[in-house]
Amino acid sequence: MKRTYQPSKTRRARTHGFLVRMKTKGGRAVINARRAKGRKRLAV
């Protein structure tokens, strides 16, 4: 059986990247929450 996680940098960035997060109101909320928490990496 094939494993579920087949890494791909392109797909990772396109689904969870910074630009994608900034597109929606909810995504911006995620970035702001991570900024407030002091996360080193805001998005993938």
Swiss-Prot record:
UniProt xrefs under InterPro entries: Ribosomal_bL34, Ribosomal_bL34_CS
GO CC annotation, single: ribonucleoprotein complex
GO MF annotation terms: structural constituent of ribosome
Alphabetical keyword list: Ribonucleoprotein, Ribosomal protein
Pfam family, one: Ribosomal_L34
UniProt record, GO biological process: translation
HAMAP family: Ribosomal_bL34 (MF_00391)
Family, as annotated: Belongs to the bacterial ribosomal protein bL34 family.
Protein name according to UniProt: Large ribosomal subunit protein bL34
